[in-house]
Regions:
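Bacterial N-terminal signal peptides
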Residues: 1-9
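Extracytoplasmic copper-binding redox domains, predominantly the cupredoxin/blue-copper superfamily
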Residues: 11-189
């Protein structure tokens, strides 16, 4: 279920605002078993749950990816990198968007080995280790992808993040209340 508002004049860029809500009984988040790696297990004070469905009691969904398809965009790629961190043996953020050609800065904030393995459909996948002494690596995707795909850690099977690689900047990830805003959408889109 999605409630949206789209406002613009013929001369101005538009803004798409909305709220993403799950319609139905929410799945119960699974408890993650991190005890195989002592660093992962000791990184959290209590049980860690899967982030696959993050939602409030009313069904508002956090970290839902909202994006436009078939948009003509002639602007540039952001100079700032998209950032993906490994914190407490969890990818942060769990869902994100970036543009084709934009740099992806991958961090390892943990004192353990991680393996970063991307699973794109169009771009060449990458698969490299980040031992605890390697704190930063850079990657990128040359082309846009038709759909979001995941990046996983081959060492810790519960670690997965979802990424949209787009040829335009018209995407957003919902906040903790399920709200999103996509700004500067060209007229006629």
């Amino acid at each position: 279920f999605l409630i949206t508002t789209f406002v613009f004049t013929a001369l101005d860029a538009g803004t798409l605002k909305g709220h993403v809500k799950y319609d139905g009984k929410a799945p119960k988040p699974k408890r993650l078993r991190m005890d195989a790696d002592p660093v992962c297990g000791s990184s959290h004070s209590g049980p860690v749950r899967s982030e696959n469905f993050k939602m409030s009691k009313d069904g508002s969904m956090e970290e839902a990816l909202v994006y436009l398809k078939n948009v003509n965009y002639s602007g540039g790629v952001p100079s700032e990198p998209a950032v993906l961190d490994q914190q407490g043996c969890i990818y942060v953020p769990h869902v994100f968007g970036m543009m084709a050609g934009q740099e992806l800065l991958i961090k390892n904030s943990d004192a353990t080995l991680h393996n970063i393995h991307s699973m794109p459909k169009v771009n060449k996948e990458f698969n490299f280790a980040m031992p605890k002494v390697v704190k930063k690596k850079k990657a990128s995707f040359a082309k846009s992808e038709p759909d979001p795909f995941y990046i996983k850690c081959d060492v810790h099977p519960w670690m997965k993040t979802w990424v949209l690689v787009s040829d335009h900047p018209y995407y957003a990830v919902t906040d903790a209340s399920g709200n999103f805003s996509i700004e500067n959408i060209p007229p006629g889109t």
